[in-house]
Amino acid sequence: MSSSPSLNTWSDALSGLSIGWFPLGLVIIAAIPLVFIALYALTYGVYGERKISAFMQDRLGPMEVGIWGLLQTLADILKLLQKEDIVPKLADKFLFVIGPGILFVGSFLAFAVLPFGPAFIGADLNVGLFYAVGIVAIEVVGILAAGWGSNNKWALYGAVRSVAQIVSYEIPASIALLCAAMLAGTLSMQQITMMQAGPGGFMHWFLFTNPIAWLPFLIYFISSLAETNRAPFDIPEAESELVAGYFTEYSGMKFAVIFLAEYGRMFMVSAIISIAFLGGWTSPLPNIGGLELNTMTSGPVWGAFWIIMKGFFFIFVQMWLRWTLPRLRVDQLMYLCWKVLTPFSLIAFVLTAIWVINH
Amino acid sequence: MSEYFSNIKTSATTIATGMGITLKHFFNAVKRKGDAGIDDADYFRQVDGLCTLQYPKEAIPTPPHGRYRLYCNIDDCIGCRQCDRACPVQCITIETIKATSDDLEACGKTSGGQQKRMWVPVFDIDVAKCMTCGICVSVCPTECLYHTPVADFSEFNVKNMMYHFGNLSKIEAEAKTKKLAEQQAQAAKEKAAAGGAPGAKPAPKPKPAPPQA
Ligand code: SF4
Ligand code: SF4
């Protein structure tokens, strides 16, 4: 499906830009999410998570470097840069080195289809949602490469657990997203968002326009936690049982890249859940009578603002959950996936289908 | 089947409760726990808010009558070694030299007016070992050994935890030892000159037999 040109004005214009043979525009388009991930991971991801976790535990968090410890993340980066880049002697060097790379690429690739606003999307694929769900699976390869390549039993355990977990949770996650796709009648992220735009603001969102959307919404949120290895599904990492799971052996910048990938994935799933159920870049404010709040807060810049805010909200919930719940046991994890989430996602799927047919 | 649903219900409600608690703490982070010390009536009522103490900059005041770091007022020490013997962990090291009779004036008196008869060239307290049990304090006859309210005396080098209190320098101590030896030799000579046979001590009394059971 070719999207209407008005949808992608910025990214279309950018991708046409090139200096001689060099496709400068494409490079800029690719760099935008990268810069975004880096900035957000540094500020909100690392610093924010530290502060949020500290506040939830009645602590202060970093305070010494800069005002309120604001420069702590920079100090950490300097520290990581100075660290020796160790590759264990008996590790499978090739796998060990490319593991973090695959992990990062896996989370970064999905940003291609995330609409960052009504006028900017890297690639408006007509199978965008499907692509986003599928590309996450690359992460499994990265984790396996890292875990196996480390030649360390903890790392291998972590990696195997992670594969079991991610492969299992892909199922309820995908079925839950299918419900959203059914409601929209399309797999294109930009189209799904457009379906939820309107003068009523949040009233057009799938979560509020039909009575069963909360079920796939919840199921996708829970599964997305598992796919990003966030607590309470962080058994691949399991720092108290497995030291640090699949990245036990990593040091310095490789470790940093693994974390960057994790924060990238966190935003990615948060953005996907916002797009599928909460209207992506559409403004939540409704037009009330003469007060055109919705019209005022729409547009390319506002769109980027809204989707980032929605993503950040879900990241906050992920952090909030992380500092609330203990880690699940492996059997509980599988129970939750196969005996709870999967049946309920199938029920949600059928109910959504009935609802869509009757409307 | 009903257990299945009740489990789901329990999980949902318990997760909601737990998240409520953490969120409450998150928003309470704008507050600070008060800095009421342990002897404050409000100590246990400071429930909400951050509890991190940024230590070197902020410290909970220790009670003015606290008993923490051991201190020896060496001017009052009579070198009786009671504390040394009483200490369960042997963290006090004392060396004493008897003052010669012409030195008694220089040796001085304790603040209680008692004549000191010992120089104490070495009085070391290893505060790293001291467990502040206070036994030494209770046996000290001149009350010159006591715990101070200073609670924070950490050091980077454990050697610095050895506190020296002696009242003589090494050279002075040598001089005093020499002087004492000379005087003793002198006294022995005088005694010999006076004709007292050295072995003429009266035999010790036999101990009374233990009572028969
Ligand atoms: S307080 Fe106790 S441990 Fe410390 S020096 Fe005195 S007797 Fe020894
Ligand atoms: S008990 Fe007191 S007077 Fe005696 S040696 Fe110890 S500190 Fe000095």
From Swiss-Prot, chain A:
<feature type="transmembrane region" description="Helical">
    <location>
        <begin position="127"/>
        <end position="147"/>
    </location>
</feature>
<feature type="transmembrane region" description="Helical">
    <location>
        <begin position="301"/>
        <end position="321"/>
    </location>
</feature>
<comment type="function">
    <text>NDH-1 shuttles electrons from NADH, via FMN and iron-sulfur (Fe-S) centers, to quinones in the respiratory chain. The immediate electron acceptor for the enzyme in this species is believed to be ubiquinone. Couples the redox reaction to proton translocation (for every two electrons transferred, four hydrogen ions are translocated across the cytoplasmic membrane), and thus conserves the redox energy in a proton gradient. This subunit may bind ubiquinone.</text>
</comment>
<keyword id="KW-0830">Ubiquinone</keyword>
<dbReference type="Pfam" id="PF00146">
    <property type="entry name" value="NADHdh"/>
</dbReference>
<dbReference type="GO" id="GO:0009060">
    <property type="term" value="P:aerobic respiration"/>
</dbReference>
<dbReference type="GO" id="GO:0048038">
    <property type="term" value="F:quinone binding"/>
</dbReference>
<keyword id="KW-0472">Membrane</keyword>
<feature type="transmembrane region" description="Helical">
    <location>
        <begin position="166"/>
        <end position="186"/>
    </location>
</feature>
<comment type="subunit">
    <text>NDH-1 is composed of 14 different subunits. Subunits NuoA, H, J, K, L, M, N constitute the membrane sector of the complex.</text>
</comment>
<feature type="transmembrane region" description="Helical">
    <location>
        <begin position="337"/>
        <end position="357"/>
    </location>
</feature>
<keyword id="KW-1003">Cell membrane</keyword>
<feature type="transmembrane region" description="Helical">
    <location>
        <begin position="202"/>
        <end position="222"/>
    </location>
</feature>
<comment type="similarity">
    <text>Belongs to the complex I subunit 1 family.</text>
</comment>
<keyword id="KW-0874">Quinone</keyword>
<keyword id="KW-0997">Cell inner membrane</keyword>
<keyword id="KW-0812">Transmembrane</keyword>
<dbReference type="InterPro" id="IPR018086">
    <property type="entry name" value="NADH_UbQ_OxRdtase_su1_CS"/>
</dbReference>
<dbReference type="GO" id="GO:0016655">
    <property type="term" value="F:oxidoreductase activity, acting on NAD(P)H, quinone or similar compound as acceptor"/>
</dbReference>
<protein>
    <recommendedName>
        <fullName>NADH-quinone oxidoreductase subunit H</fullName>
        <ecNumber>7.1.1.-</ecNumber>
    </recommendedName>
</protein>
<dbReference type="GO" id="GO:0005886">
    <property type="term" value="C:plasma membrane"/>
</dbReference>
<feature type="transmembrane region" description="Helical">
    <location>
        <begin position="19"/>
        <end position="39"/>
    </location>
</feature>
<keyword id="KW-0520">NAD</keyword>
<keyword id="KW-1133">Transmembrane helix</keyword>
<feature type="transmembrane region" description="Helical">
    <location>
        <begin position="94"/>
        <end position="114"/>
    </location>
</feature>
<dbReference type="InterPro" id="IPR001694">
    <property type="entry name" value="NADH_UbQ_OxRdtase_su1/FPO"/>
</dbReference>
<feature type="transmembrane region" description="Helical">
    <location>
        <begin position="266"/>
        <end position="286"/>
    </location>
</feature>
<keyword id="KW-1278">Translocase</keyword>
<dbReference type="GO" id="GO:0003954">
    <property type="term" value="F:NADH dehydrogenase activity"/>
</dbReference>
